[in-house]
Amino acid sequence: MNRFTTSQGAFELARFPEHPRDPFRAWDAADDYLLQQLTDPGTGPVDLSGTVAVVGDRWGALATALAAHRPVQISDSYLARRATLANLARNGIDEDAVRLLSSRDTPPDRIDVLLVRVPKSLAFLEDQLHRLAPAVHSGTVVIGTGMVKEIHTSTLKIFERIIGPTRTSLAVRKARLIFSTPDPALPRTLSPWPYRYELPADVGPVAGLTAVNHAGIFCAERLDIGTRFFLKHLPTRSGAVRVVDLGCGNGVLGLSAAVANPDAHLTFVDESYGAVASAEETFRAGAPAGAKADFLVGDGLADLDPGSVDLVLNNPPFHSHLATTDATARTMFAGAKTALRRGGELWVVGNRHLSYHTHLRRIFGNCTTVAGDPKFVVLRAVKR
């Protein structure tokens, strides 16, 4: 937990889930710069009396600081939502002060102030601006914020194409602001997302089926090479086993398990609302008739009963925004051990340099290498 002092007040903030030894803060200079801009006497304070929409607030720092203005927070991240609720409570703020919407929810009809934390994915930025543009009017104040290394010419072009004329601020503490002036004359076009592609011929049971990808999921325009390698080495199971695609992305791992064993009961889990929507559409498009599946947006396997799962398939992320970390993978591995029955198995694909085998041996007491190439390795751990 750390203290965030702004012109709106001082707040105690933490990421979610909170880890006592987590070196990363729940806010950064880009959040601070944006909040300063809203009260800058040089440009005149921004009128926050109308509908304020905060998009992509990573850990609730912006929503918490602006809670007095009853903002709408729009996020693709379940963990960001939980962080926001926890940070509001931590600072004695009623959770009803912030209206929480997911990236898949219908946005407000009218937005008077649109504050955008620039995401890593330009596709996600494009999709969200397309969805929000109908609510923007000629008087809407539109401000984006991000670290300098997150904002590129391509970022500005997206704002300009969808919202209107766009300029940037000077950099302050390696953060920069984006100012867009809404142009009502711009044509209102639909988002090009989701994107669909046919799975290649060398990936086992799902070859030739369709993957559906909403904006913002990892490697949304093609099958990522780690998943492609994993698909060639997935375990085979028969009967009414329960299989979880953990951190499912577009769901092709779980789909492969369902196609290979139509009697299996699949559960797709991700903390991204867009990912779970992608997985559900991928499954509906390619699964055998009668195949059974659940789709959960959540914090790993926390919502599953302990000892209820036979097989977990996992391609864990190793980035948290711009930071490289194995914390998410370790949390997923520990959650998988809890969710698995005795004799149940966790299968993982990862880059060789991440050394996931050390974490699996520590958590499960065992780890076997199933397959590998110069870049990737498929690992198997069994709950004893």
From Swiss-Prot:
**Coiled-coil residue windows:** none
Localization recorded for this chain is: Cytoplasm
Report the principal subcellular site.
Answer: cytoplasm
| rRNA processing in keyword set | yes
Q: Out of the domains of life, which is the source?
A: Bacteria
Q: Which GO terms describe its molecular function?
A: 23S rRNA (guanine(1835)-N(2))-methyltransferase activity; nucleic acid binding
* Reactions catalysed according to its record: guanosine(1835) in 23S rRNA + S-adenosyl-L-methionine = N(2)-methylguanosine(1835) in 23S rRNA + S-adenosyl-L-homocysteine + H(+)
**Mind telling me which InterPro entries this protein's record contains?**
DNA_methylase_N6_adenine_CS, rRNA_m2G-MeTrfase_RlmG, RsmC/RlmG, SAM-dependent_MTases_sf, Small_mtfrase_dom
Name a single GO cellular component. Answer: cytoplasm
Enzyme type, top EC level: transferase
Q: Name one Pfam family in it.
A: MTS
Which keywords does this Swiss-Prot/TrEMBL entry list?
Cytoplasm, Methyltransferase, rRNA processing, S-adenosyl-L-methionine, Transferase
Tell me its EC number(s), please.
2.1.1.174
Q: What Gene3D superfamilies does its record include?
A: Vaccinia Virus protein VP39
Family designation: Belongs to the methyltransferase superfamily. RlmG family.
* Annotated function: Specifically methylates the guanine in position 1835 (m2G1835) of 23S rRNA.
PANTHER family cross-referenced by the UniProt entry: RIBOSOMAL RNA LARGE SUBUNIT METHYLTRANSFERASE G, RIBOSOMAL RNA SMALL SUBUNIT METHYLTRANSFERASE C
Instruction: Provide the protein name.
Output: Ribosomal RNA large subunit methyltransferase G
Q: Which organism is it from?
A: Streptomyces griseus subsp. griseus (strain JCM 4626 / CBS 651.72 / NBRC 13350 / KCC S-0626 / ISP 5235)
